[in-house]
Amino acid sequence: MDVMDDVKSVLCLKALEASNERASDCIQRAGASIRKIPRIPSIIRVKKKYSTFRVLTDTSHDLLVLVNEGFSDGEYVPINVELELCYEYFTYSEVLRRILPEEVQTPSSFEIVGSIVHLNLDGEQMKHKNIIGRVVHDKTGKTVITKIGQISNAYRSFDLEVIGGDPVLETIHREGDILFCIDYRSVYWCSKLQSERAILAGKFKAGEVLCDPFCGVGPVSLPALKKGCRVYSNDLNLRAIECLEKSIKINRLDPRNIEIFNLSANEFLEKMAGRKIDHFFLNLPEHSLDYLRRISAWEGNPLVHCYFFCRSNEDVVQYIFSRTGLRVDPGMLKVVRKVSPSKYMYKLETSSLFLRRGLG
């Protein structure tokens, strides 16, 4: 027997009985007393088969009009009605609260990327991963994954396990007015940075030149390209580059305005030497600072948007100096988000001229 067969509940309500011919009159008399219940119609057609519940009460009438307790009318007398709520009625969290052991917390949030639901299950939840994956898949219709390892490679991808739905993890995700091709198993994507990406894209102007040494699948390169910028995009991860190229086609963007490279960042920046750049976007937080000194010497005074991690117990200005030999003004820094109890992501925004002035 399927455990989901036991996920049901009986709801006792008051309702008015009516024929199809008297439906309008009955509804009008009930008026403001018609009862509203989430995911259940206030007017139930007795002969209709509903996927989320079934009527247990026998009636010879065509309709049941749900009303609040205490409703009184001279012509229509409320009757007691029982509805059996089925598995399909309940939300994923309601189902899991019913079937998981009491000591196991129901996953309270998840990230949706295209056709994929990304959970981060803890130790106790992992013991019940298959049932959790099945329920979330049933309720969303999407593939369900959970992370089983930390980001530990140059591509910033992580080990994961499919616990519900189709194991194919290439998906199309919409962010704003752009569609992104994402191979979730092989590339890095963080929806939590969506608002930050929108802020950054708002700073680009048509005709400007963006250099993106760690472009990934293009969360910044593509918006810049769509705004009419000239874009130089690079990533060491070939799969990310393949996804970026697919996204350019999907969004019908002009490929003549973007040059794409599959090189190390150092090799890429060597190729860029001498080219006019208006914006450098550095988003490889563990290593972005390592490239600041090189960019500080860039001609033309480009703007630098550099994202990096720093532990909460460190002086961030001193940390930058220890990594780069550059002294920066605290006004150039902004906290983007807290990534762990002891680590923050920061953004450093300045120009190459100001970076040169900070040379130690």
UniProtKB/Swiss-Prot annotation:
TM stretches of this protein: none
Catalytic reaction annotation: guanosine(37) in tRNA + S-adenosyl-L-methionine = N(1)-methylguanosine(37) in tRNA + S-adenosyl-L-homocysteine + H(+)
GO process annotations (BP): tRNA N1-guanine methylation
InterPro entries noted in UniProt: MeTrfase_TRM5/TYW2 (IPR030382), SAM-dependent_MTases_sf (IPR029063), TRM5-TYW2-like_MTfase (IPR056743), TRM5/TYW2-like_N (IPR056744), tRNA_Gua_MeTrfase_euk (IPR025792)
Residues engaged in binding S-adenosyl-L-methionine: R197, D235, L236, N283
Species whose genome carries this gene: Encephalitozoon cuniculi (strain GB-M1) (Microsporidian parasite)
Any one GO molecular function term: tRNA (guanine(37)-N1)-methyltransferase activity
GO cellular component: mitochondrial matrix; nucleus
Cellular compartment(s): Mitochondrion matrix; Nucleus; Cytoplasm
Its job: Specifically methylates the N1 position of guanosine-37 in various cytoplasmic and mitochondrial tRNAs. Methylation is not dependent on the nature of the nucleoside 5' of the target nucleoside. This is the first step in the biosynthesis of wybutosine (yW), a modified base adjacent to the anticodon of tRNAs and required for accurate decoding.
Keywords for the protein's UniProt record, in alphabetical order: Cytoplasm, Methyltransferase, Mitochondrion, Nucleus, S-adenosyl-L-methionine, Transferase, tRNA processing
Keyword Nucleotide-binding: no
Similarity field: Belongs to the class I-like SAM-binding methyltransferase superfamily. TRM5/TYW2 family.
E.C. no: 2.1.1.228
PROSITE patterns the record matches: SAM_MT_TRM5_TYW2 (PS51684)
Quaternary data: Monomer.
Lineage of source species: Eukaryota, Fungi, Fungi incertae sedis, Microsporidia, Unikaryonidae
Presence of the UniProt keyword Nucleus in the record: yes
Name used for this protein in its record: tRNA (guanine(37)-N(1))-methyltransferase
Enzyme class: transferase
